[in-house]
Amino acid sequence: MKPALRLQLDRYVRRLAELDSLLADPAVMRDAGGFRALSREHVEVSGIVERQRRHAQRERDLAAAAEMASDPELAAMAAEEAASAQAELDRLATELQRLLLPRDPDDARSVFLEIRAGTGGDESALFAGDLLRMYTRYAERKGWRVELLSASDSELGGYKEVVARIEGDAVFGHLKYESGGHRVQRVPATETQGRIHTSACTVAVLAEPDEAQEVTLNPADLRIDTYRASGAGGQHVNKTDSAVRITHLPTGLVAECQDDRSQHRNKAKAMAVLAARLRDKDRLERQAREAATRKSLIGSGDRSDRIRTYNFPQGRLTDHRINLTLYQLGAIMDGDLDPVVKALVAAREAELLAELEIG
């Protein structure tokens, strides 16, 4: 193991002791938000320290096997133990290197998911509905909670635009690479000649800020409009001006919410979406600056990039960023998104490891 890696691991051992002490402090326990953040960090640090301790034990086992090898009667046993210890040491070193890669602090957060129909008219709107269903089914598999915040329905079904909140552990870490252009190739239900049409949707995944990260909004920079909600929402949906639209005048960013009968709650949710969009705008600008010096295959986050094609006649999904092709489109559209998510995460980790090797 490299000396620099050992120094990093020593810092994690010390940090684990600090976290144990902090989490036992009554003052920390009274701060629910701070306690949750420290608890999440404790889980992460504990996993690293556990592997570090196992690595140290296997190093001792390897040294003991080397001593045993000098005894002819124990040489065969020593060789077997040395091979076992070395194999586990190699595996643990790889795991530790991966765990010590730079972490996106937003990975643990819940998200706002935005899907917008693009080229393709009604077929694009129908595909937006299919994408929402795919992400909803995936969230159900993960035990996450999905809350529809606003939707603009199309005439034939689907959505011109839909915004949902997905709440749970590490939602952003799983879904952040979904941002970008999604292209679909299939025969629309309205097509009488059996011709394959191509249409597209844009997906944006925004990390939900916590209270400590909340963007400060100047009331003078906001225009708040109320209107009657439309679309699916129950029998009371059109009776009051409960829907809220908030415009951030300096940037032109807009957020709206119409899912609740309470105007007050809709306003609070719309403000949360607006804060996430402003924070995401800063993130994208920062990534654009970084991209000027380092081209990242996976993490560019450019919403104009076509990242994926869904070819229904062939049952094929292709992610163009990592040249991934899977012939299991039906299962993926039904929420089995892990094969795609894990491949993207692995590709990004490989990029980071390569950067560390170069550095």
From Swiss-Prot:
Q: Which PANTHER family match?
A: LD18447P
Chief place of localization? cytoplasm
- Please list the GO terms describing molecular function: translation release factor activity, codon specific
UniProt-listed InterPro entries: PCRF (IPR005139), Pep_chain_release_fac_I (IPR000352), Pep_chain_release_fac_I_sf (IPR045853), Prokaryotic/Mito_RF (IPR050057), RF-1 (IPR004373)
Tell me a GO cellular component.
Answer: cytoplasm
Q: Which residues carry this modification: N5-methylglutamine?
A: Q235
Q: Is the Cytoplasm keyword given for this protein?
A: yes
Specify the species. Methylibium petroleiphilum (strain ATCC BAA-1232 / LMG 22953 / PM1)
**UniProt xrefs under SMART domains:** PCRF
What gene is this protein translated from? prfA
**What family does the database annotate?**
Belongs to the prokaryotic/mitochondrial release factor family.
The entry's function note states: Peptide chain release factor 1 directs the termination of translation in response to the peptide chain termination codons UAG and UAA.
**Pfam family of this protein, just one?**
PCRF
Where does it reside? Cytoplasm
What keywords does the record list, in alphabetical order?
Answer: Cytoplasm, Methylation, Protein biosynthesis
State what protein this is by name: Peptide chain release factor 1
What's the PTM story here?
Answer: Methylated by PrmC. Methylation increases the termination efficiency of RF1.
Q: Does the keyword Cytoplasm apply?
A: yes
